[in-house]
């Protein structure tokens, strides 16, 4: 194989020496190959060969380190093939295994292990399991809080009063834990915590205009004001050349000048901007403006209306800026910040105290966590001089002398701690740091990555040869086709800039085509071509003629709607993507299958499912739905979701089994295990056991069942006379024997050994392997086994501690995600997050969910925090019950918002640049007409997308669509929604766009040729007269009548409501209907019209009222306001929705509790609400029994029974007897009360009979409470 042909820039990177070199390597530019070649040339140089162990190579992942080590090993091997006697090369192969090609954490661990004595660390330390550390954190925070409560610490109590939610301090604990994790990404976390608090410790001379908060706010306001200026320019252009609108234009011009003055003031200082904002006023547009004649041309009216609309929106936006950030003078701000000092100082104190407690707990257990790894290494490698500056320690100097050069891969993802660490071991006299990365691909800010580190060097280093601090840019893309490169450049030239994106996407940064795809002889069959955009709307209004101006509604509510993205909307887009994939895979018009280029064969082959990847910004909610929909369309799919492990049935079962082995006195896990395939108890078995006694826990009743030999006269009155079946008794005995065996084994086996013993002894591991998805299920069980092995390495031991360990793990950290069983060569469409795709490439990339709004949940936190700006707390005066975002919080929100948008832009860049041959973009929007109108605003007059529009973007489509709608290729999208096509940009990128109507993809219709009626099939059957020796026998069998035919129609269980229907209407057709299994097909939400979606049925209304009556706190129903408050609480906790709450009348509920029956219920000691009941009932007890069976056959059914099920609304004990209450929400008037009673009487009578049987107490009274007339009817 020939040697690579390096570009000029790549050769400069490979050959430059003795400098700090920053390599800005764009996506697909071959940075890894260049980095490896540089190392190879260093160690194989004839003039000055370097030993491989003299190089420190820091990679981002272990996989990258392994790949690099392997590549270097291969290169050394090839060099030895050419020169087998070379001792230096032979030595390099030996040194390679102990070379420092590693991750930053591995390097830090080596430093710690070699110098543990410098930080008084036990040499036998181990790295704590992530979940074990999470548990220790929780224990530490709880203990710190308990101590502070006992000490009555005033600052702490003030903090809790300010930010604790009603009924607990969990939110405050989360604040402390969040700030601790954030602070640990600082080289000096204690200093950061103290400085962040002390920034609020100001005096009377404080000048807000000189603060970092003011500068942060102004950075955002500048963008906003400049955007408003551009809007006013657009408005002026609409009217300035129309004579009839001269006065109107003059007024617009005055306002434009005022806003331009504000823009200039923002560039000067906060005070200047504040003055201009305060003096800003808008013109009266009625006074002094000529009325337009009715006969005036329509274009004049349209121009005026368009200009006025732009102006009104500008006015509203400016007023919003003033009210949010320019509504306080310096004195007010000073008092606000001084007040907040009493909040933020305790925050830092509590975080520091938590850090100390957590550290003590880790030391007690002899463990360190990942934060410790970096900070302990930092403590070893640095000292602090007399001026407080960080300087390298003597140990760091030793490393400086050891390493000839330090290589840092993916430098754009370094954090501040890593920067200080590697700077400490780098040479200063002869610069020797090689840093390679791409700031446009920095997407780990949520892990405290600091792209600013890369940008600082990018802006300060020069590209001159011989410079000690040099940068070289690699922007030739060797991955993607021209169409992909052009599309990426077109989008990012328009949207990425220094303010949002943190780098200007200029000619230097744009991708340059470098890939070579050998052209196939049949170009029509090659996959590729124009970049595609597919949009689908959610509300099916594509054909509306009128485009309503709903920008404000969309901007205000879209975020809220996206937070609870409806399943149906995700399904819609998934189905659309499925259709796109099928189009890619099908034979084209010329009978050809589309092909992709395969480097392995240096040629083209048919596209396969494995060539396609679907990239999502976040996978948790979307990926499972996409996977299900695609598989339903016969598209093999794998979604790497990363959650759901603890929800799998096999893991739930084994964890329940472990729980009851430790403690069988737990009903829920016990019943879960009993009805699992391990023991095979049926619902009837469980009922047989439960009805033996209502008072005992299930395990005690189970033991009694196993010992059953007939109850004696000594049975207590609460025990049932139901006799368990022999099979049930035997199952119970077998269970207890095995449980005892398991308990004994667990006493002397390690946890992991015991779990594997359970797998094999019960046969459960083999059982799940035979189920659908068996290999995945077995892999999940293996993960639990591996988790148990890790647990055994901790100081905790035993089943009890392991169960607690898992429970705390579920509460304290994210779900682990199911085990991965997919091979890299499996022929499936992959669904993955954009983050996981980084560093990968695929022939076809489908970027989906581009219409999903950016996550802004962090802004809802009580306290924001930032490395440079410190704290941004919510202002809370709990005594005066005042709460609002402080000016500091507004500053942090502005800064973090820009940083987050920059991160999102880089995420989008990573997604697009994964594509080798075909890029497809998909998204959904609530109304395509409204959205396209909004996206196309101003495209005819602006050369580029304004930073203001980028700042206001809510999702990726808000950035992509304003760019592409300027392009000639997508004129069809504008025309399809009734807008004029405007072409403002000449660009060689190619685009294809399609608007999908959801009705087009709901059902895949068969073609007419595929349809064949049943009648046509029957006509083909040759029906001859029967002529067979077996005719008589066959006829006899076919005419046989089963004597127990009624039993075949009898259900296993029947509800009281169904019996009520039978008894009220005993026509056989109704009876047969009730005794048949019913399947209710509810119309999916996404094909319901708006009226159907909004409608709440009478049944649903009743269900909601019953739910509220079930969960109400009966100690707090003494007033209508009490009940209203509780209902609001149910909404906030997610028990009911706002819409559901709106149909509950709290006054009606209050009247119930104020009634005689309500007061009696409140006074009762024992109250049961929404109680599920089950009972075996003889069919003869159902009055209509006589109508069902012929008289001659009645004796066949003497013992025929059915399991009766129902839910009793409420019953309570009074004078050792039962009072039964049933709520009814039916529409009732005074005239039909008796009809209602007759309608429900039989139902209550059945409930009463069952309750008497189950409780052993008589029902003295049965009451129906009619909410319609606020009246109870008792008998």
From Swiss-Prot:
Alphabetic keyword roster: ATP-binding, DNA damage, DNA repair, DNA-binding, Exonuclease, Helicase, Hydrolase, Isomerase, Nuclease, Nucleotide-binding
Residue intervals of the UvrD-like helicase ATP-binding domain: 4-481
Cofactor: Mg(2+)
Secretion signal span: none
Recorded catalytic activity of this chain's protein: Couples ATP hydrolysis with the unwinding of duplex DNA by translocating in the 3'-5' direction; ATP + H2O = ADP + phosphate + H(+)
Binding annotation for ATP: 25-32
Domain UvrD-like helicase C-terminal: 531-839
GO BP annotations, alphabetical order: double-strand break repair via homologous recombination
GO annotations of cellular component type: cytosol; DNA helicase complex
InterPro entries: AddA (IPR014152), DNA_helicase_UvrD-like_C (IPR014017), DNA_helicase_UvrD/REP (IPR000212), P-loop_NTPase (IPR027417), PDDEXK-like_dom_sf (IPR011604), PDDEXK_AddAB-type (IPR038726), Restrct_endonuc-II-like (IPR011335), UvrD-like_ATP-bd (IPR014016)
Gene Ontology MF: a single term: 3'-5' exonuclease activity
Record-listed E.C. numbers: 3.1.-.-, 5.6.2.4
Assembly and oligomerization: Heterodimer of AddA and AddB/RexB.
HAMAP family per record: AddA (MF_01451)
Function as written in the Swiss-Prot or TrEMBL entry: The heterodimer acts as both an ATP-dependent DNA helicase and an ATP-dependent, dual-direction single-stranded exonuclease. Recognizes the chi site generating a DNA molecule suitable for the initiation of homologous recombination. The AddA nuclease domain is required for chi fragment generation; this subunit has the helicase and 3' -> 5' nuclease activities.
Similarity comment text for this entry: Belongs to the helicase family. AddA subfamily.
Protein's recorded name: ATP-dependent helicase/nuclease subunit A
Record lineage: Bacteria, Bacillati, Bacillota, Clostridia, Peptostreptococcales
């Amino acid at each position: 194989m020939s040697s690579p042909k390096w570009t000029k820039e790549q050769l400069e990177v490979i050959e430059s020496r003795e400098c700090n070199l920053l390599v800005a390597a764009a996506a697909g530019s071959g940075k890894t190959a260049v980095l490896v070649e540089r190392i190879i040339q260093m160690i194989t140089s004839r003039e000055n060969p370097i030993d491989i162990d003299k190089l420190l190579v820091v990679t981002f992942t272990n996989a990258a380190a392994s790949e690099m080590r392997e590549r270097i090993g291969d290169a050394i091997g090839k060099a030895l093939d050419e020169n087998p006697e070379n001792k230096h090369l032979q030595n390099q192969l030996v040194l390679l295994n102990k070379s420092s090609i590693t991750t930053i954490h591995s390097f830090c661990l080596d430093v710690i292990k070699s110098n543990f004595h410098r930080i008084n660390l036990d040499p036998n330390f181990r790295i704590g399991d992530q979940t074990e550390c999470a548990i220790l954190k929780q224990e530490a925070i709880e203990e710190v809080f308990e101590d502070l409560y006992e000490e009555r610490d005033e600052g702490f109590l003030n903090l809790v009063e300010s930010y604790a939610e009603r009924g607990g301090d969990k939110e405050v604990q989360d604040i402390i834990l969040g700030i601790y994790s954030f602070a640990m990404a600082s080289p000096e976390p204690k200093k950061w915590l103290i400085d962040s608090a002390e920034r609020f410790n100001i005096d009377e001379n404080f000048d807000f205009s000189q603060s970092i908060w003011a500068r942060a706010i102004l950075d955002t306001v500048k963008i906003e004001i400049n955007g408003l200026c551009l809007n006013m320019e657009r408005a002026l252009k609409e009217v300035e050349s129309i004579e009839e609108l001269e006065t109107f234009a003059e007024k617009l011009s005055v306002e434009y000048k005022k806003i331009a003055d504000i823009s200039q003031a923002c560039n000067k200082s906060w005070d200047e901007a504040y003055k201009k904002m305060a003096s800003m006023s808008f013109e009266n547009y009625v006074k002094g403006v000529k009325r337009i004649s009715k006969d005036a041309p329509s274009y004049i009216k349209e121009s005026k209306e368009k200009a006025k609309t732009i102006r009104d929106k500008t006015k509203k936006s400016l007023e919003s800026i003033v009210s949010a950030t320019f509504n306080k003078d310096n004195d007010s701000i000073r008092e606000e910040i001084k007040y907040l000092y009493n909040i933020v100082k305790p925050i830092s104190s509590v975080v520091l105290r938590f850090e100390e407690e957590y550290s003590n707990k880790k030391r007690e257990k002899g463990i360190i966590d990942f934060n410790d790894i970096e900070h302990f290494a930092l403590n070893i490698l640095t000292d602090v001089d007399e001026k407080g500056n960080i300087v390298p320690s003597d140990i760091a100097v030793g490393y400086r002398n050891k390493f000839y050069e330090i290589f840092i891969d993916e430098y754009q993802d370094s954090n501040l701690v890593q920067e200080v660490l590697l700077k400490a071991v780098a040479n200063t006299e002869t610069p020797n740091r090689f840093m390679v990365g791409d700031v446009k691909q920095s997407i780990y800010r949520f892990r405290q990555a600091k792209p600013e580190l890369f940008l600082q060097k990018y802006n300060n280093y020069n590209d001159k040869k011989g410079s000690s601090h040099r940068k070289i840019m690699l922007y030739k893309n060797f991955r993607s086709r021209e169409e992909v490169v052009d599309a990426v450049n077109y989008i990012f030239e328009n949207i990425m800039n220094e303010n949002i994106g943190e780098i200007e996407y200029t000619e230097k940064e744009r991708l340059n085509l470098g890939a070579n795809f050998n052209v196939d002889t049949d170009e029509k069959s090659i996959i590729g071509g124009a970049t595609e955009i597919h949009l689908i709307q959610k509300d099916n209004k594509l054909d509306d003629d009128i485009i309503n101006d709903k920008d404000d509604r969309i901007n205000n509510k879209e975020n809220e709607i996206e937070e609870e993205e409806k399943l149906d909307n995700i399904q819609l887009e998934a189905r659309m993507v499925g259709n796109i994939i099928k189009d890619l895979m099908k034979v084209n018009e010329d009978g050809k299958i589309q092909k992709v280029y395969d480097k392995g064969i240096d040629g083209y082959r048919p596209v396969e499912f494995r060539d396609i990847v679907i990239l999502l910004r976040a996978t948790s909610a979307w990926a499972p739905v996409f996977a299900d929909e695609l598989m339903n369309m016969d598209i093999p799919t794998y979604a790497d979701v990363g959650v759901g492990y603890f929800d799998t049935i096999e893991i739930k079962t084994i964890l329940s089994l472990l729980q009851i082995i430790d403690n069988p006195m737990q009903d829920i896990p016990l019943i879960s295990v009993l009805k699992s395939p391990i023991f095979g108890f049926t619902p009837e078995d469980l009922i047989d056991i439960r009805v033996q006694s209502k008072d005992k826990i299930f395990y005690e009743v189970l033991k009694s069942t196993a010992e059953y030999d007939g109850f004696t006269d000594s049975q207590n009155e609460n025990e049932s006379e139901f006799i368990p079946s022999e099979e049930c008794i035997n199952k119970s005995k077998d269970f207890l024997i095995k449980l005892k065996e398991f308990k004994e084994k667990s006493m002397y086996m390690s946890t992991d050994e015991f779990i594997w013993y359970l797998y094999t002894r019960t046969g459960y591991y083999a059982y799940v392997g035979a189920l659908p998805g068996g290999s995945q299920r077995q892999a999940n069980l293996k993960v639990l086994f591996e988790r148990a092995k890790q647990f055994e390495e901790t100081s905790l031991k035993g089943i009890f501690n392991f169960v607690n360990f898992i429970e705390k793990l579920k509460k304290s950290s994210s779900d682990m995600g199911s085990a991965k069983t997919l091979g890299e060569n499996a022929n499936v469409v992959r669904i993955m997050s954009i983050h996981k795709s980084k560093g990968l490439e695929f022939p076809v990339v489908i970027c989906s969910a581009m219409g999903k709004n950016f996550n802004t949940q962090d802004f809802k936190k009580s306290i924001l925090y930032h490395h440079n700006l410190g704290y941004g707390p919510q202002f809370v005066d709990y005594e005066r019950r005042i709460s609002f975002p402080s000016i500091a919080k507004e500053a942090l929100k502005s800064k973090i918002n820009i940083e987050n948008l920059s991160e999102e832009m880089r995420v989008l860049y990573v997604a697009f640049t994964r594509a080798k041959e075909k890029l497809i973009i998909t998204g959904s929007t609530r109304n395509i007409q409204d959205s396209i109108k909004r996206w196309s605003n101003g495209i005819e007059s602006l050369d580029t997308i304004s930073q203001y529009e980028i700042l206001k973007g809510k999702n990726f489509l808000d950035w992509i669509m304003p760019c592409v709608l300027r392009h000639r290729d997508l004129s069809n999208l504008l025309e399809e929604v009734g807008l004029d096509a405007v072409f403002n940009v000449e660009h060689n990128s190619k685009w294809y766009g399609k608007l999908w109507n959801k009705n087009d993809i709901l059902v895949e219709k068969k073609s007419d040729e595929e349809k064949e009626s049943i009648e046509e099939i029957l006509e083909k059957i040759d029906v001859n007269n029967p002529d067979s020796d077996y005719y008589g026998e066959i006829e006899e069998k076919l005419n046989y009548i089963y004597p127990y035919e009624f039993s075949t129609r009898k259900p296993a269980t029947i509800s009281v409501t169904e019996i009520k229907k039978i008894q009220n209407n005993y026509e056989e057709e109704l009876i047969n209907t009730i005794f048949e299994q019913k399947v209710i097909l509810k119309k999916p939400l996404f094909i319901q019209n708006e009226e159907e979606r909004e409608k709440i049925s009478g049944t649903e209304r009743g269900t909601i009222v019953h739910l509220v009556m079930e969960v109400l706190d009966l100690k707090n129903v003494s007033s209508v306001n009490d009940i209203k408050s509780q209902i609001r609480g149910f909404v906030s906790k997610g028990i009911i929705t706002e819409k559901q709450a709106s149909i509950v009348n709290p006054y009606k509920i209050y009247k119930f509790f104020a009634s005689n029956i309500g007061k009696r219920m409140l006074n009762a000691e024992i109250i049961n609400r929404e109680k599920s009941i089950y009972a075996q009932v003889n069919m003869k007890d159902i009055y209509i029994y006589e109508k069902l069976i012929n008289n001659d056959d009645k004796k066949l059914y003497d013992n025929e029974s059915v399991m009766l099920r129902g839910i009793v609304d409420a019953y309570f004990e009074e004078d050792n007897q039962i009072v039964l209450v049933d709520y009814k929400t039916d529409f009732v008037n005074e005239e039909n009360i008796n009809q209602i009673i007759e309608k429900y009487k039989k139902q209550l009578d059945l409930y009463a009979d069952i309750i008497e049987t189950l409780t052993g107490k008589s029902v003295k009274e049965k009451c129906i409470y009619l909410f319609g007339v606020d009246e109870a009817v008792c008998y």
